[in-house]
Design a protein with these regions (language model features):
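Predominantly flavin-linked oxidoreductase catalytic cores and closely associated redox partners
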Residues: 1-130, 135, 185
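Detector for Asparagine
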Residues: 11, 15, 21, 46, ...
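A short, glycine/Asx- and small/polar-enriched loop/turn
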Residues: 23-29, 154-158, 241-242
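Short, Lys/Arg-enriched charge-dense amphipathic segments
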Residues: 35-46, 157-174, 230-243, 251-262
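Broad hydrophobic/π-residue packing in well-ordered secondary structure
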Residues: 39, 44-53, 101-107, 122, ...
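Contiguous hydrophobic segments
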Residues: 52-78, 174-187, 249-275, 319-327
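FAD/FMN-dependent oxidoreductases across multiple families
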Residues: 108, 117-233
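Long, low-complexity C-terminal extensions of enzymes
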Residues: 190-327
Length: 327
């Protein structure tokens, strides 16, 4: 972001949006900021995130997914390395907890970790106690993050769209927000190309059938993407063997009506039907006993077609460190 602001083609306005002027059928001619200025533009992109305390000036409407994905909060804290060579690895560990799961993600400077949990099954204080106990340090004070599993009813409108957490959020497991943001960005590129090729025709504000059809198809595709990721995450909860707390029991009994449809959509999109994928096969592929997903690199690899052992793999820490030295 800081690099983008340095471009002479970018006009950065440090202000807060107080009101969005919305005309018929959702067309936005301008918005008003707290300083009183009116900002006009051809197209607006809402990236305000999911801060529940921020006023919804874009009047976004959401469908809740909270009855399917039960987690609603996370406590997070950065940990220092105690033995970087042993703790630094190129994957995230997802560890089950009593009322959710904990992620452990090594970065270059620190270890990112947090506990995603359901506030309907445990209080924040109880979650912090469980989190700090699992870490082994009761003195730390983690930050508390609120979120709501939900998806925007209409990602793309006449001359605006929502992207990132402003468009919706599921939960941190598998970081689906990254993939979904990439999907919306890709579609936005296509829509802008169509939009500006028709923009001189002012009828696009109210009555441009081609543009309307494009938006309808794009919005339906985004909804299917969110539905697929929802069932993908839910599958990992359902195939986990934990049944020792009310949270895991409740998550096991969540309705799963969209799974068959999601599999059909996946097959249609990826042509996986050639591999005869089904529910059980996919469940065994993406879920382990305790939702601990990681793929440690073996020291030696012996492919069946090779008679000689390949040389040992370079340690991930040494590999990344070589890039830092190159800088």
């Amino acid at each position: 972001k800081k690099q983008a602001f340095k471009s002479p083609k970018v006009n950065f306005i440090p202000d807060t949006v107080s009101h969005v002027n919305i005309e018929g059928q959702g067309y936005i001619p301008s918005l008003v900021v707290e300083s009183g200025d009116i900002i006009e533009a051809d197209y607006f992109v809402n990236t305000t995130g999911q801060n529940l305390k921020v006023k919804n000036v874009f009047n976004e409407q959401y469908d809740s997914i909270g009855d399917t994905l039960l987690t609603t909060k996370a406590v997070v804290y950065p940990l220092p390395y105690t033995n970087k060579r042993e703790q630094f690895h190129p994957y995230t560990v997802a560890k089950t907890m009593k009322n959710g799961w904990r992620w452990i993600t090594p970065t270059w400077e620190r270890i990112g970790t947090g506990y995603t949990f359901s506030e309907n099954h445990i209080s924040v204080d109880q979650a912090i106690d469980e989190f700090t106990t699992d870490i082994g340090d009761k003195s730390i004070v983690p930050n508390v993050v609120d979120f709501r599993p939900r998806v925007n009813k209409q990602t793309f409108k006449v001359n605006s769209c929502s992207i990132g957490m402003a468009n919706g959020f599921l939960e941190p497991l598998d970081a689906p927000g990254l993939a979904l943001t990439n999907t919306v960005t890709f579609m936005l590129e296509k829509i802008l190309s169509n939009y500006y090729s028709n923009f001189r025709d002012k009828s696009i504000k109210t009555n441009n059938n081609y543009h309307s059809i494009t938006l309808t198809l794009a919005n339906e595709a985004i909804k299917k993407s969110y539905k697929f990721w929802t069932t993908f995450i839910l599958n990992q909860y359902k195939t986990c063997h934990r049944l020792d707390t009310p949270f895991w029991i409740d998550q096991k009994h969540v309705k799963w009506d969209d799974w068959t449809l999601a599999i059909k959509d996946l097959n249609a999109y990826c042509d996986l039907h050639k591999n005869d994928y089904d529910v059980m096969m996919l469940a065994q592929t993406i879920a382990s006993r305790n939702i601990q997903f990681y793929t440690p690199v073996p020291k030696e690899i012996k492919p069946p077609q090779l008679s000689e052992t390949l040389p040992p793999t370079q340690h991930h820490l040494d590999y990344i460190e070589s890039f830092h030295k190159f800088k």
